[in-house]
Amino acid sequence: MKFVIEHLSKSFEKKVVLKDIDFTFEEGKIYGLLGRNGAGKTTLFNCLNRDIKADGGNIDTDGVRREVTAEDIGYVLSTPTVPEFLTGREFLKFFMDINEKSIKNPKSLDEYFDYMSIEPDDRDKLLKDYSHGMKNKMQMLINIIAQPNILLLDEPLTSLDVVVAEEMKQLLRSLKGNRITIFSTHIMDLALDLCDEIVLLHHGELEVVEKTDLDSREFKDRIIGALREGEDE
């Protein structure tokens, strides 16, 4: 599967955020989307997810004119959005009930909790009492159950403790084989550790940086240099 973006653009009043973007993402890879704060990473994700309307461009799959649908995309926000008046178990059951016809090979609720390393004592707690990391796990879990072809992750490891962040990285690596994963971050070392391809969002355009040597100082300097270009303009 391929996820094809053609001539995507978005402006807010006089500020151009996305400028005539052409890019193709391929199945089986985790793409690290790097950019400075305010570069437009979240705007790009919101356009891809149809949360906001792009000014122009096409978003298709497999290089054919089949528009990407809501079922194609899972979106994990940097700040988890969950119904805090429900328990973890109630939320998971509600999600599975309303998506019963589309969930492939469903498992029991406890099997899903086990998969995400959510402890038995936490499963019947209200979501408002979950930590940031646990809410993030629940948000990831419903996207895993839905099995979207394209997974957008907007800085999902922000504010997670070391253990939960490592669990999430291992999970993403295990899931990448049959989907396209686009991981937004401004933390370069995290992108280099987790991602197969590095993509810069820079001056409203996407640019691939070849990963010739992940550990080389030269490689990191190239990324930093590209992001610094024009910062004083």
Question: What is each stretch, according to the model?
Answer:
Residues 3-5, 18-20:
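Conserved structural motif at the start of ABC-family nucleotide-binding domains
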Residues 162-164:
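Helix N-cap at the start of a conserved alpha-helix in ABC-type nucleotide-binding domains
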Residues 49:
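Helix-to-loop junction immediately C-terminal to a conserved catalytic motif
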Residues 151-155:
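Catalytic Walker B motif of ABC-type/P-loop ATPase nucleotide-binding domains
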Residues 34-36:
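The feature captures the beta-strand-to-loop junction immediately N-terminal to the Walker
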Residues 54-69, 208:
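Conserved ABC transporter NBD signature motif
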